[in-house]
């Protein structure tokens, strides 16, 4: 999701990589939980949120061992099927975008602060409201901005705030 991408990128303030992206069934479930078209959609979304590299694991399904339960871009019989062609099409599209634009990082004028100390305090320490989940509250503010088409970064309280016109601080721990 865009929120997860922003949390990861916001902690680094630079482009990110997505290792071991999911293409189909996983070892945890045998259902085909990734519908056709979703890996392409996710890769385009990753690019829009500052991802520089995304890899799928496994590329080819295994014949044995725990990984034989996981779908790959290609199944263990090496026959190219729809997943392979979808990844191939996506790679071509992303290459064309990179050729025209170069590396892209989103430019946001709004930021939502995610403070790890506050996160720890509310999740592990004493709180006045046991149902209060700090990360859920951060998401609510982020989602409110995005639902109004306002691009927002999720950044640390230690980050440089000078480039932002709006800064949302969900909670502070003193």
Residue ranges: model-predicted function:
Residues 1-174:
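Carbohydrate-binding surfaces of carbohydrate-active enzymes
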């Amino acid at each position: 999701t865009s929120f997860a991408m922003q949390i990861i990128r916001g902690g680094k303030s630079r482009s990110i990589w997505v290792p071991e992206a999911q293409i189909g069934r996983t070892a945890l479930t045998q259902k085909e939980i990734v519908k056709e078209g979703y890996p392409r959609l996710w890769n385009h979304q990753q690019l829009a949120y500052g991802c520089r590299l995304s890899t799928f694991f496994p590329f080819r399904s295994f014949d044995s061992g725990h990984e034989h339960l996981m779908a790959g871009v290609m199944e263990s019989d090496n026959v190219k099927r729809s997943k392979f062609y979808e990844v191939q099409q996506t790679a071509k599209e992303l290459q064309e975008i990179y050729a025209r634009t170069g590396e892209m990082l989103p430019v946001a004028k709004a930021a939502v602060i995610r403070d790890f100390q506050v996160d720890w305090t509310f999740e592990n320490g004493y709180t006045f409201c046991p149902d209060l989940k700090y990360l859920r509250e951060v998401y609510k503010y982020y989602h409110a901005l995005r639902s109004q088409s306002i691009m927002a970064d999720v950044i640390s309280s230690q980050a440089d705030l000078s480039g932002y016109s709006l800064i949302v601080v969900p909670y502070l721990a003193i």
